[in-house]
């Protein structure tokens, strides 16, 4: 019987779809799957459903005798050696679109949380308490009417821009290509990175990672930002040099930061945890019931298509 190996628990809606068609084995151990377990799991599998946290390198691919598809449960796919998979005639798919609204919502949530000191205020209210309303007490920054600078105006970046416009924000964006139709639809302005850094009150990273973007935001870039600026990263951790971010916060080069992704994920740079003006969330960009269920359906449906001889919908290689 055709076999599918799943590298970790996924929502039942996708799991049940796969079980209707194939023999399914799923890793259900504690923590992330280790390399040897994954190699054993894929040895006789026709399909691998990998998680964004699953490293699928050449060694893993070479361990699989029958593999036809790697269906990645995530919009990104930098955890997979995509080119080598193609050389072995293995399709790699992802789950685009499903993450868009959830991640855009979180991006705006991070902006509001750090600018209005919501997390800090929650902690104060639960611990020492406060003496009541006062004119100079616990002031933050307004979001409405400010300028947002979006690095990466893809689907998620575009959704962030639409939400920002509802706050009457001016929208700047940068990326490898100008997107004139989106500019007109959203009311965004294309600028180079330096111009964005110098003018934005909130700089949001919503780009997918590739090696050319490694440490795109480093000491030089922080020094170009406003002293009242906030950095928001809901894209990929390695785009930001976290040590440079720590130094920028220490030296009050910028006013604060909010991160959902990390350079050394799942590890978080310890120094970041000490700043009250930093909000940290555990990579929950698309962690909604709706998004995660949709992602499960996509990986299941693309796996079913491939193993039934049809072309998957979301091939990335």
From Swiss-Prot:
CDD domains, per the entry: 2-Hacid_dh_13
Gene3D superfamilies the record matches: NAD(P)-binding Rossmann-like Domain
Class of the enzyme per the UniProt entry, highest EC level: oxidoreductase
Pfam families for this protein: 2-Hacid_dh, 2-Hacid_dh_C
Domain of life per record: Bacteria
Listed EC numbers: 1.1.1.-
Residues bound to NAD(+): 155-156, 234-236, 260, 283-286
GO molecular function annotations of the record: NAD binding; oxidoreductase activity, acting on the CH-OH group of donors, NAD or NADP as acceptor
SUPFAM superfamilies on file: Formate/glycerate dehydrogenase catalytic domain-like, NAD(P)-binding Rossmann-fold domains
PROSITE patterns, per database record: D_2_HYDROXYACID_DH_3 (PS00671)
Active site positions: 236, 265, 283
InterPro entries for the chain: D-2-hydroxyacid_DH (IPR050857), D-isomer_2_OHA_DH_cat_dom (IPR006139), D-isomer_DH_CS (IPR029753), D-isomer_DH_NAD-bd (IPR006140), NAD(P)-bd_dom_sf (IPR036291)
Key words, A-Z: NAD, Oxidoreductase
Family to which this protein belongs: Belongs to the D-isomer specific 2-hydroxyacid dehydrogenase family.
The protein's name in its UniProt record: Putative 2-hydroxyacid dehydrogenase SE_1879
């Amino acid at each position: 019987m055709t076999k599918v190996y799943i590298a970790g628990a996924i929502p039942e809606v996708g799991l049940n779809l796969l079980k209707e068609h194939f023999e399914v084995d799923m890793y259900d151990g504690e923590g992330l799957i280790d390399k040897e377990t994954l190699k054993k799991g894929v040895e006789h599998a026709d399909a691998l459903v990998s998680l964004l946290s699953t490293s699928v390198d050449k060694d893993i691919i070479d361990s699989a005798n029958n593999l036809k598809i790697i269906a990645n449960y995530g919009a990104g796919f930098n955890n997979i050696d995509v080119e080598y998979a193609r050389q072995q005639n293995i399709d790699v798919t992802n789950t685009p679109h499903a993450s868009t609204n959830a991640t855009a919502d979180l991006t705006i949530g991070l902006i509001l949380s750090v600018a209005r000191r919501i997390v800090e205020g929650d902690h104060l209210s639960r611990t020492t308490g406060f003496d009541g309303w006062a004119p100079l007490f616990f002031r933050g920054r307004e979001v409405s009417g400010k300028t947002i600078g979006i690095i990466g105006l893809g689907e998620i970046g575009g959704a962030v821009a639409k939400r920002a416009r509802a706050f009457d924000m001016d929208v700047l964006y940068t990326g490898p290509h100008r997107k004139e139709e989106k500019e007109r639809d959203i009311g965004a302005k294309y600028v180079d990175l330096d111009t964005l850094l110098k003018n934005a009150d909130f700089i949001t990273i919503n780009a997918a990672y590739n090696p050319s973007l490694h440490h795109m935001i480093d000491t030089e870039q922080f020094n170009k930002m406003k002293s009242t600026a906030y950095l928001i990263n809901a894209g990929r951790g390695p785009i930001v040099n976290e040590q440079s971010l720590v130094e920028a916060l220490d030296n009050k080069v910028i006013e604060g930061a909010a991160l959902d992704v990390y350079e050394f994920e799942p590890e978080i740079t310890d120094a970041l945890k000490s700043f009250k003006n930093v909000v940290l969330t555990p990579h929950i960009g698309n962690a909604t019931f709706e998004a995660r269920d949709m992602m499960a359906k996509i990986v299941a449906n693309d796996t079913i298509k491939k193993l039934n001889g049809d072309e998957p919908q979301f091939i990335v290689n």
